């Protein structure tokens, strides 16, 4: 391990942690692996070309030794990730304890900037009252590690900070033994999934993050928000501006296994987790509030609750708060029982709360009484956190969005029309579709008949909407609030969904006016769809019927923007600029029609799917596009990295809130030069499309990446492609990006950029100067270049050339790889030129350090992957080769800390 990289005194603890974990891992290898494997791993830690070292050593290794070496390299990547995460948290705590104010991206710093920007208390309160920030957890299959492996990692992470606190050799030895034990368990556990995840597995994984992290992190963050705002702006209240949402169990786009049953299962699991949390907190409150009427006064509201208590113990006769809490717990658990949850209550069960608001009202009675009668500290502790939790989580824990492809909605509408004796929907043009749909939406008459046998697809789709209605009735109106139309291209796509909502009781029509219980959310994903977003929405806003629908939903229209497909379609530069332009146009359009806009950003973890630091990404949005309303998807490895630990979760959620408020209250920013950006986009698009439409490109991609092996990794419940893979457009964005990361090209995040800059700046120094100026001062262009810089720092063209050698057509591969290699050279040169630096990551010491530590093991894993892919292509039925490819895919993903 290259610990000389950690020569900054601030990194001394990281160096010590890394060395400590490294020694534990070598202890394990000495016991479990052959001397040749141990020696090879030692050589890798100091090698300048670990892939070449692997190529030299591999012929000497048998299958078991190859397996052990692969696993060891992956484990080194894991422990370095853990050491870095612990160090980041350590530095944050040191920063806070030193009283240096908030770091960039913290609420403390954002509040300071608001104050410095002359924002007054009234404007801040107004903005808080109109702010809604949601991190939406999705089941996108990008987490390569099993939950079992993640659990081992969390245990090591929890133990590692103790190393600094060990005051003697015995304490250090005990810690060493604990970590050695965990590493042994990790070594002897299968790294890969043997079976494909089911939707229910994904639901369980998603739910697990709440007791692990969110139930602790959100109340703490709200308490910090209250402190920061009230310190700067006395009297300012913090409403429920931050929530967690989800797709897991409701997203059926491309996933035939999501059904009404999985939706119901999801909410039962949600409710089970949140009611267990409430029961635990109420039990703790019961123990913490033995206040006696001999010592304190009590408000009449609490006395009334106490009088209805099922807690009849004589010892409680003078303890009204405990008796009231027993009553509240019995009613809350009564609701849990009514929802079919199998959990008990030591006080028995009383009449269930009809809503989370009723539960909340009773808790607030306790709080008010404590404050009124001299017990404010008790009111502002656990009880305040529980009140906030109930307000945020309700009975449903997190709302789930529904999502389906526009074409699937249209298929259901067509069948309903057919059986009702109406027009042939599929033969109608767009204008005729709108007319027919509006006609059916203008009155109460349903099209569906229970006496007709419909296709499996139609029954399946209508069942999900019907189940969503029942869930809203049982778990609360906020349980399901959005229905997203993926691949939305026309106004009829929105009206078709509206008709399905009407057919299933989620949208009612009274006196010709609609009232919806759910938001209709178009998702614009491709370059063409993004360019057409404004015309589609303007058509909708001109409809009196839709205007009335929006009125029933608070006059807010949510728009989802897809980063993944637009990037796959047009490349990173063009995708970024099209998204920016779409937002600019939508801001003006919504102003024109006086509709409030909420943007939902469908970002992945990788730059090729819209990823990158959230703080910079939000601040880079066009002025007026945030306005306090934002939703962002979080998936797979991003959920693990950001939210699996309460401290990490609090910090990352704080960043989302801070950036949203800063972008909303201090939105004064200059848009990039549209003419310059459009020219950059046009040329970049041209070169990107030339590559991916080359007749030999698809074969090159399939043969020189582990795309087909990724499909067998059992990462998620849905298929890797929507249909048989013959074209790039048929491939899902996640495996597309995942594969380019594995072969170390990261092509979707930079291809075309270099040629665009070179073309525009040729003999035009003023254009180069303009681009450099944008690189220094424009948030949009800065974020684009920063993301590109991070990706190019992980790109290794030499390793990528080894993958090119896997092609079955060397002459054709030479041409395609030649195009890629030349574009990489141009793009790297252009990036350095615009950043006016001679090396990548010069100003990002943290990432540079991180990569330098992991690169020996990462490159070794790539070397192993190429060798095993070569063997697997020759011997397709070789189980050892396939397992090794799977292990290297896991290891490379961990080393890069990204998948798709």
Curated annotation (Swiss-Prot):
Disulfide bonds: none annotated. It catalyses: oxaloacetate + phosphate = phosphoenolpyruvate + hydrogencarbonate. InterPro entries: PEP_COase, PEP_COase_bac/pln-type, PEP_COase_Lys_AS, PEPCASE_His_AS, Pyrv/PenolPyrv_kinase-like_dom. GO terms for biological process: carbon fixation; oxaloacetate metabolic process; tricarboxylic acid cycle. GO terms for molecular function: magnesium ion binding; phosphoenolpyruvate carboxylase activity. Its cofactor is Mg(2+). Its EC number is 4.1.1.31. It holds the Pfam family PEPcase. It is an enzyme of class 4 (lyase). It comes from the Bacteria. Keywords: Carbon dioxide fixation, Lyase, Magnesium. One of its GO terms (cellular component) is cytosol. The active site is at residues 140, 568. Belongs to the PEPCase type 1 family. Forms oxaloacetate, a four-carbon dicarboxylic acid source for the tricarboxylic acid cycle. PANTHER family: PHOSPHOENOLPYRUVATE CARBOXYLASE. This is Phosphoenolpyruvate carboxylase. It comes from Neisseria meningitidis serogroup B (strain ATCC BAA-335 / MC58).
């Amino acid at each position: 391990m290259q610990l000389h990289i950690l020569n900054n005194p601030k990194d001394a603890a990281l160096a010590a942690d890394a060395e400590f974990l490294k020694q534990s891992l070598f202890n394990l290898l000495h016991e479990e692996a052959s001397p040749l494997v141990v020696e090879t791993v030692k050589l890798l830690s100091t090698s300048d070309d670990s892939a070449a070292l692997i190529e030299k050593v591999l012929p000497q290794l048998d299958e078991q030794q190859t397996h052990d070496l692969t696993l060891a390299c992956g484990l080194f990547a894991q422990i370095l990730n853990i050491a870095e995460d612990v160090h980041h948290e350590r530095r944050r705590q040191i920063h806070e304890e030193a009283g240096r104010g908030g770091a960039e991206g913290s609420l403390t710093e954002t509040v300071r900037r608001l104050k410095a920007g002359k924002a007054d208390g009234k404007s801040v309160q107004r903005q808080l009252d109109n702010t809604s920030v949601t991190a939406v957890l999705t089941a996108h299959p990008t987490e390569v590690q099993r939950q079992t492996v993640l659990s081992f990692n969390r245990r090591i992470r929890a133990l590692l900070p103790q190393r600094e606190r060990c005051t003697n050799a015995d304490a250090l030895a005990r810690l060493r033994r604990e970590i050695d034990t965990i590493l042994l368990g990790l070594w002897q556990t299968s790294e890969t999934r043997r079976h494909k995840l089911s939707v229910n597995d994904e639901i369980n994984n998603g739910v697990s993050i709440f007791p692990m992290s969110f139930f602790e992190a959100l109340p703490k963050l709200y308490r910090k928000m209250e402190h920061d705002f009230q310190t700067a702006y006395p009297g300012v209240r913090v409403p429920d501006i931050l929530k967690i949402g989800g797709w897991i169990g409701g997203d059926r786009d491309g996933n035939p296994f999501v059904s009404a049953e999985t939706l119901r299962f999801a909410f039962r699991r949600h409710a089970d987790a949140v009611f267990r949390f409430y029961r635990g907190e109420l039990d703790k409150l019961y123990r913490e509030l033995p206040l006696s009427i001999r010592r304190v006064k009590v408000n009449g509201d609490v006395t009334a609750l106490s009088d209805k208590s099922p807690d009849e113990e004589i010892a409680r006769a003078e303890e009204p708060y405990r008796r009231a809490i027993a009553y509240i717990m019995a009613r809350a658990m009564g609701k849990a029982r009514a929802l079919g949850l199998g959990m008990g209550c030591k006080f028995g069960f009383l009449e269930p709360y009809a809503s989370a608001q009723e539960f909340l009202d009773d808790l607030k009675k306790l709080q008010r009484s404590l404050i009124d009668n001299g017990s404010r500290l008790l009111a502002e502790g656990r009880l305040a956190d529980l009140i906030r939790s109930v307000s945020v989580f309700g009975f449903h824990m997190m709302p789930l969005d529904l999502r389906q492809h526009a074409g699937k909605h249209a298929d259901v509408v067509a069948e309903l029309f057919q059986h009702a004796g109406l027009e042939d929907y599929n033969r109608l043009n767009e204008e005729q579709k709108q007319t027919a749909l509006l006609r059916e939406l203008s009155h109460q008459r349903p099209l569906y008949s229970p006496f007709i046998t419909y296709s499996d697809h139609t029954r399946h789709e209508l069942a999900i909407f019907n189940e969503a209605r029942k869930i809203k009735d049982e778990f609360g109106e906020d349980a399901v609030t959005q229905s997203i139309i993926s691949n939305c291209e026309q106004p009829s796509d929105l009206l078709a969904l509206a008709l399905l909502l009407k057919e299933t009781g989620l949208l009612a029509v009274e006196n010709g006016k609609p009232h919806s219980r759910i938001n209709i959310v178009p998702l614009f994903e491709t370059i063409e769809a993004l360019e057409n977003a404004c015309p589609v929405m303007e058509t909708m806003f001109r409809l009196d019927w839709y205007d009335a629908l929006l009125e029933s939903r608070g006059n807010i229209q949510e728009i989802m923007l897809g980063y993944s497909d637009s990037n796959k379609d047009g490349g990173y530069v063009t995708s970024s600029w099209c998204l920016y332009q779409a937002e600019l146009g939508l801001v003006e359009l919504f102003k024109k029609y006086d509709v409030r806009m909420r943007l939902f950003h469908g970002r992945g973890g990788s730059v090729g799917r819209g990823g990158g630091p959230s703080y910079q990404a939000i601040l880079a949005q066009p002025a007026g596009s945030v306005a306090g309303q934002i939703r962002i998807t979080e998936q797979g490895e991003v959920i693990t990295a950001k939210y699996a630990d309460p401290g990490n979760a609090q910090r990352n959620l704080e960043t989302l809130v801070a950036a949203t408020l800063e972008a909303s209250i201090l939105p004064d920013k200059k848009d990039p030069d549209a003419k310059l950006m459009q020219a950059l986009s046009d040329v970049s698009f041209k070169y990107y499309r030339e590559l991916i439409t080359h007749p030999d490109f698809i074969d090159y991609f399939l043969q020189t990446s582990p795309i087909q092996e990724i499909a067998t990794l059992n990462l998620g419940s849905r298929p890797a492609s929507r249909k048989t893979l013959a074209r790039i457009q048929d491939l899902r964005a996640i495996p597309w990006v995942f594969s380019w990361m594995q072969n170390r090209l990261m092509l979707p995040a930079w291809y075309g950029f270099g040629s665009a800059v070179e073309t525009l700046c040729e003999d035009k120094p003023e254009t180069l100067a303009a681009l450099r100026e944008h690189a220094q001062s424009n948030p949009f262009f800065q974020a684009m270049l920063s993301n590109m810089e991070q990706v190019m720092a992980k790109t290794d063209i030499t390793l990528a050339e080894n993958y090119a050698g896997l092609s079955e057509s060397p002459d054709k591969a030479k041409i395609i790889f030649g195009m890629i290699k030349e574009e990489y050279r141009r793009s790297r040169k252009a990036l350095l030129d615009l950043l006016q630096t001679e090396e990548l990551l010069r100003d990002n010491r943290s990432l540079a350090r991180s990569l330098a530590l992991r690169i020996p093991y990462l490159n070794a894993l790539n070397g192993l992957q190429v060798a095993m892919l070569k063997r697997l292509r020759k011997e397709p039925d070789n189980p050892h080769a396939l397992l090794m490819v799977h292990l290297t895919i896991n290891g490379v993903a961990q080393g890069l800390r990204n998948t798709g």
